[in-house]
Amino acid sequence: MIAREWKARCPKEQKKDFIKYLYQTGVKDTSSTKGFKDAQILSRDLEDKVEITLITYWDCLESIKTYAGDDIEVARLYPEDFRYELEPDDFVIHYEVINSIF
């Protein structure tokens, strides 16, 4: 299994709305892609912003290509991201999941 991690920062007052939007875009699109297994959204407060992390889980790298395109290291961003004053990471990180107990 492969974990795909993407991060972005936004103003704290945008957190609730951005997470709702993230469900409507990134989570919706990934979860409807063959090979998708699960997703987690994490957040942590920074000094004046909040950092949101989306981790999606996939059966293999080929499934991620179906969602992300040939260059799976490039983050898939959405046209309305700017509404949330988002500071997105342009690239994602992939991990091999060795073990998962939950």
What are the residue ranges of the model-derived segments?
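Short hydrophobic/aromatic beta-strand micro-patches
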Residues: 9, 42, 55-57
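Glycine-rich beta-strand-turn "strand-cap" elements at beta-sheet edges
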Residues: 2, 40-50, 77-102
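Short, glycine- and small/hydrophobic-rich beta-strand elements in well-ordered beta-sheets
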Residues: 27-53
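Non-catalytic surface loops within mature trypsin-like serine protease
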Residues: 10-12, 60, 96-99
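Active-site-flanking beta-strand signature of metal-NTP-handling nucleotidyl enzymes
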Residues: 2-8
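Short, surface-exposed ligand-recognition loops at beta-strand->loop->(often short) alpha-helix junctions
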Residues: 9-22
